[in-house]
Design a protein with these regions (language model features):
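Short beta->alpha linker loops
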Residues: 131, 195, 324-328
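Generic beta-strand structural signal
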Residues: 79, 91, 103-107, 115, ...
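Canonical Radical SAM [4Fe-4S] cluster-binding loop centered on the CxxxCxxC motif
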Residues: 97-135
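Conserved AdoMet/S-adenosylmethionine-binding subsite of the radical SAM
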Residues: 144-153, 158-322
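Conserved alpha-helical substructure of the radical SAM core
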Residues: 123-153
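Auxiliary Fe-S-binding modules of radical SAM enzymes
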Residues: 1-91, 244-253, 259-356
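P-loop NTP-binding catalytic core
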Residues: 87-97, 101
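Short linear Ser/Thr-Pro motifs
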Residues: 74, 108-109, 192, 215
Length: 356
C-alpha cells in the first residue's frame, strides 16, 4: 500500500486487517501528510499507532518520493522545482510567494498535456501520462519541507489539464484540504481548466469545495479555436452553459482566465463578445499576459491593456491583472516544460525550516 496515495477512507480500508480504531487510522494519515514523517517506520512509530497496525505498515506499506533534479529562483522570489518520478517522466512545480505571509504551490497533474494550446510550452511536449495522486501531493510536500513560511494554497495550473486526470486530482485536493492532511482551505485550492465540459459538469454535480478557473481567452469562437484546440471538441456555447451551471450551483462568481495577446484578443469587439457570452452569469475576469518563449505571441502593450480594461467596463464585473512571475526561469503561466535555464540554481537546503 502506498501511504501517500490513499485518502482517509481508503487508508481505513487498507488497514482493516489490523482492526485499527478510527483514532489510529487518523494518526497514520496525519503522520504521512500533516507531520510529514519521512519513512514507513517513522509513521509506524507515531504515538497512538498500535503494534498490530505498525506491523502491518512495516510489512506492506511504502512511501515513494519524487527526486528533486533542480531548484531555480527568479528575481521576484518565484522558485521552480524540477522533479523526476520513479514512474517515469519529469514534471515541474512552482513556489509562489504571496507577500511576506505564505506560499502558494502551483502543481502539475500530468506529464505533458494533450490539449496543445498554441501559446503553451507544456502542450508542445505532447501527452505522456497522468500523474498519480501521490506524485501530485509529493510536489507540495517537498516544497513545503523547504519553505520558510506556511503553504496556504495550491493551484492546479502547472503541466497538464487537471480535469483530464479527474480521479487523481480530486483525491489529491481532498487530502490537501483534510484537517489531518495538509489542512489547506478548500477555497484556497484552484483547478484551472481549458474547458473540458463533461468534467466541469461532473465537478459541479459532485459539489466539491474547491474552485475552478476557466480559461476562455476569447469569446469569439473563431479566435478561440486558433489558440485553444479544445474549442473544436467542446465549443464555447457548451462551455458557457457549463460555467452558468457551476456559478448557479455555487452561488458565486465564476473565475474567467483571459490570456492577453498583443494584436489578437484585446479590441472592443472582444469585450463585447465577452459581455454577450456571459450575459446573466456573475463572473470575475483575470487578465494574464501571455508568456511565449517562441515569440509567436507577444504580451500586450501598456496602452493596449489599458484600453482593453476600459472596454471591459461594460461587463460590470471585477477585473484583475494576474501577475505571472518567474519568467526568466520558465515558471510563468504556460511555460512549464521540464526546462532548465535562467535564474539562480539553489543548493539543497542543509536543514528543513518548514512551518507546517
Amino acid at each position: 500500500m502506498n501511504l501517500k496515495q490513499l485518502s482517509l477512507p481508503e487508508l481505513e480500508a487498507a488497514l482493516a486487517p489490523a482492526q485499527p480504531s478510527a483514532t489510529a487510522v487518523r494518526k497514520v494519515f496525519a503522520g504521512v501528510f500533516a507531520h510529514a514523517r519521512p519513512t514507513v517506520d517513522a509513521v509506524a512509530l507515531a504515538p497512538q499507532v498500535p503494534r498490530r497496525v505498525a506491523d502491518l505498515l512495516r510489512a506492506q506499506a511504502e512511501m515513494p518520493s519524487l527526486k528533486i533534479v533542480e531548484r531555480r529562483q527568479a528575481e521576484d522570489g518565484f522558485v521552480k522545482y524540477l522533479f523526476e518520478s520513479p514512474l517515469g517522466g519529469r514534471i515541474e512545480a512552482v513556489r509562489i510567494p504571496i507577500f511576506e505571509e505564505k506560499y502558494v504551490v502551483c502543481v502539475s497533474s500530468q506529464v505533458g498535456c494533450a490539449l496543445a494550446c498554441d501559446f503553451c510550452m507544456t502542450g508542445k511536449l505532447g501527452f505522456q501520462r497522468n500523474l498519480q495522486t501521490w506524485e501530485i501531493l509529493d510536489q507540495v510536500m517537498q516544497v513545503r519541507a523547504e519553505a520558510d513560511r506556511r503553504v496556504g494554497g495550491v493551484v492546479f495550473m502547472g503541466m497538464g489539464e487537471p480535469l483530464l486526470n479527474y480521479k487523481e486530482t480530486i483525491r489529491a485536493a481532498q487530502i490537501l484540504s483534510h484537517p489531518a492532511g495538509f489542512s489547506i482551505s478548500g477555497t484556497a485550492i484552484t483547478f484551472s481548466t481549458a474547458g473540458h465540459v463533461p468534467a466541469i459538469r461532473r465537478y459541479t454535480k459532485e459539489g466539491h469545495p474547491f474552485r475552478l478557473a476557466f480559461s476562455v481567452t476569447s469569446a469569439i469562437p473563431e479566435k478561440r479555436a486558433k489558440v485553444l484546440p479544445i474549442e473544436k471538441t467542446h465549443p464555447l456555447p457548451e462551455l458557457i452553459q457549463a460555467i452558468r451551471e457551476y456559478s448557479e450551483a455555487r452561488r458565486e462568481r465564476a473565475m474567467i482566465a483571459y490570456v492577453a495577446i498583443q494584436g489578437f484578443n484585446l479590441e472592443r469587439e472582444d469585450a463585447e463578445a465577452l459581455k454577450a457570452a456571459f450575459e446573466g452569469i456573475p463572473i470575475k475576469v483575470d487578465l494574464i499576459d501571455v508568456t511565449d518563449p517562441t515569440g509567436k505571441y507577444l504580451p500586450p502593450t501598456a496602452e493596449e491593456l489599458s484600453a482593453f480594461r476600459d472596454h471591459l467596463q461594460i461587463l460590470k464585473a471585477p477585473i484583475a491583472r494576474r501577475y505571472s512571475g518567474g519568467k526568466e526561469i520558465g515558471a510563468a503561466c504556460g511555460t512549464l516544460a521540464a526546462s532548465q535555464y535562467g535564474g539562480t540554481v539553489l543548493p539543497t537546503p542543509a536543514a528543513s525550516p518548514r512551518q507546517a
